[in-house]
Amino acid sequence: MMPLLHLAGTLIMALFLSCLRPGSLNPCIEVLPNITYQCMDQNLSKIPHDIPYSTKNLDLSFNPLKILRSYSFTNFSQLQWLDLSRCEIETIEDKAWHGLNQLSTLVLTGNPIKSFSPGSFSGLTNLENLVAVETKMTSLEGFHIGQLISLKKLNVAHNLIHSFKLPEYFSNLTNLEHVDLSYNYIQTISVKDLQFLRENPQVNLSLDLSLNPIDSIQAQAFQGIRLHELTLRSNFNSSNVLKMCLQNMTGLHVHRLILGEFKNERNLESFDRSVMEGLCNVSIDEFRLTYINHFSDDIYNLNCLANISAMSFTGVHIKHIADVPRHFKWQSLSIIRCHLKPFPKLSLPFLKSWTLTTNREDISFGQLALPSLRYLDLSRNAMSFRGCCSYSDFGTNNLKYLDLSFNGVILMSANFMGLEELEYLDFQHSTLKKVTEFSVFLSLEKLLYLDISYTNTKIDFDGIFLGLISLNTLKMAGNSFKDNTLSNVFTNTTNLTFLDLSKCQLEQISRGVFDTLYRLQLLNMSHNNLLFLDPSHYKQLYSLRTLDCSFNRIETSKGILQHFPKSLAVFNLTNNSVACICEYQNFLQWVKDQKMFLVNVEQMKCASPIDMKASLVLDFTNSTCYIYKTIISVSVVSVLVVATVAFLIYHFYFHLILIAGCKKYSRGESIYDAFVIYSSQNEDWVRNELVKNLEEGVPRFQLCLHYRDFIPGVAIAANIIQEGFHKSRKVIVVVSRHFIQSRWCIFEYEIAQTWQFLSSRSGIIFIVLEKVEKSLLRQQVELYRLLSRNTYLEWEDNALGRHIFWRRLKKALLDGKALNPDETSEEEQEATTLT
């Protein structure tokens, strides 16, 4: 029974394994599909065979491979880079690298290889870089790499090598350029050690012997030897040993000699002129001195250094270098991380390049006299410039490169007169003063590169970049503009291809700012405060490839999104305040449609509304908007209908009452001859003049007056309509300044108009009590129009004027009045009297 159970278990396991896809058990990480794989520290005991044959880069470091057997890499014919660091490899069998014809870099660091057979490196026909650091190698003689005819760089640092002898097989390595033997145990250098170089003068080799405890160099050891570079750093335990060894390097021809110590490896107690005298018998083109503490200031007066082309001091405790003789033919001088004080006022007629950076002491710029200078780097010195920049500052007309970045305050007092050849100018992280007070760069028509980033500049002068007609790179991040608005400062810079406006606190962009930048390829607008994305600003940028608007406050777009240049390939809109609402539906849909060239579009998140905050922009759906639109449309229409009906009812309420009243009283007789509409300010005139002459005169008229005839306890509006209009034949409107300014009077007048329209008769009599300014009268358009087109009565406070006024008013009131016989005789008598 048990064998059957074992058989069943085996079959189930086999079935399970057969269902796994090929390569699913591969522990390696696919960095680039089919190109780069990382198998570091996966406890592999052999080379995995399920990695694609097309792999070019393979990291197998920190795996216990122990032995590299023959044909281990047959499946990797395309491999170019192989890292086998610390794989505990002790043995490399012949033909272990078979098939690696394309391999160019091999790293064997940290493997305790016991021995190398003559065929250990066979098959590596194109290997250019071999790293065998910390392999416990004791000699180059047993390191059989003579077959590596393409080898250019050999690194055997941190080993146990005691002899500097370069074996005979080096004669096969005709392409060898650099050998790193640093941190070994080489103590002596003899004549025979360099026989290979003496017999092969065509080899242009660089040797690094740093950190070897050299205590002697045999006389004539370097006689007739040519090297491209020789590095001797932290090799000598005293100045005397160094002095003796330098004297025995007589006859050496070296392009670049690097001498000194490391920052954390200091052995020499002093370094003076006598130590350097040994170099007088060495032919040197470039000399570099590094990390020397006790340095004699007169060392640069050594005449044997007069003819070198390049001098470099790095980390040297040098205090001043002002007395370099004028006849020195130095063409390049570098002073990096030194302790100069004060600023060196050099006068070297042959100097073309000068670098003074990261000085450890505070210094202020002083004028120079360097007529051949083309390259000047004074960055990272916290220097102050009391005036910049013109020919008088540097004493040259040939300057092409000027770096004044990471300094203190730079006062711009000139516009680079005499420096018209400048092509590169860097002020970043220095504080520029007066840079916007005039066209500072007007003379720099050949300038190609300008960096004024983080210079505390507020740009309020549109002519700041006048003259820069050749400029192709402009960096101005970290500054600000007037009113936080990008103004038209680029009109003259038509050749720009790179423009950085990040972190400029921009909120708006003026129209046409970029319209002349037809060649611009990269525009960085990130880390500003832009609220909208307006494609019209970028419409004329026909060559634009990259646009970065990330880290702004953009909610949506303005204008037509299709106006972006067709050349645009990379667009970054991440980290903005995108509003995922239906109002911006077109913009959100455009974001979805442009996924191909929007950077990290899948990470773009909504900032509002609250219920959508932190959700992905791509998750916003248009269908939601259609539902919302339907609900909102129905709701809005319903509200509008109800509001309109309510408004009409409210607005025409009294008119409706008037209509109803007209129907009710249409067949009844009028009680009053006229209903008087007037302002309370004119009540005295109504009582003393109008009532007295009409109700007590002949014929007599009955007037409806609100203070006398309105029924108490009834709403005023109801009294006006029912007692005033419905029971009166006519309406007298007393027009005055107070009348026009009274909203209640105007309301009564509007009801009177409706009454006149419904009664189909001319029943309104206008009395203009006083002169009213036309400007005031025009405020009531309808009243002004009626007074302009109809006859009205004007009150004149004189005998003749009164006589005519009352005669005309009574005549108007008699129109349509039914008179009894008594009233008729009285009327005739009154008429006779008036005649």
Curated annotation (Swiss-Prot):
Signal peptide stretch: 1-25
Q: How is it modified after translation?
A: Phosphorylated on tyrosine residues by LYN after binding lipopolysaccharide.
Tell me the function of this protein: Transmembrane receptor that functions as a pattern recognition receptor recognizing pathogen- and damage-associated molecular patterns (PAMPs and DAMPs) to induce innate immune responses via downstream signaling pathways. At the plasma membrane, cooperates with LY96 to mediate the innate immune response to bacterial lipopolysaccharide (LPS). Also involved in LPS-independent inflammatory responses triggered by free fatty acids, such as palmitate, and Ni(2+). Mechanistically, acts via MYD88, TIRAP and TRAF6, leading to NF-kappa-B activation, cytokine secretion and the inflammatory response.
Q: Which residues form the TIR domain?
A: 670-813
User: Single GO molecular-function term?
Assistant: lipopolysaccharide immune receptor activity
- Indicate the transmembrane segments per the record: 639-659
Per the record, ranges on the Extracellular side are 26-638
UniProt KW keywords: Cell membrane, Cell projection, Disulfide bond, Endosome, Glycoprotein, Immunity, Inflammatory response, Innate immunity, Leucine-rich repeat, Membrane, NAD, Receptor, Repeat, Signal, Transmembrane, Transmembrane helix, Ubl conjugation
List, for all copies, the residue spans of the domain called LRRCT. Answer: 576-627
Q: Which residues are glycosylated?
A: 34, 43, 75, 172, 204, 237, 248, 281, 307, 492, 495, 524, 572, 575, 622
Q: Where are the LRR repeats?
A: 54-75, 78-99, 102-123, 126-147, 150-171, 175-198, 204-224, 226-247, 372-381, 398-420, 421-442, 446-467, 470-491, 495-516, 519-540, 543-564
Localization, UniProt: Cell membrane; Early endosome; Cell projection, Ruffle
Which family, according to UniProt? Belongs to the Toll-like receptor family.
Domain comment from the record reads as follows: The TIR domain mediates interaction with NOX4.
Disulfide-linked positions: C28-C39, C280-C304, C388-C389, C580-C606, C582-C625
- Origin species, per record, is Rattus norvegicus (Rat)
The name this protein goes by in its record: Toll-like receptor 4
For this UniProt entry, what's an example GO CC term? early endosome
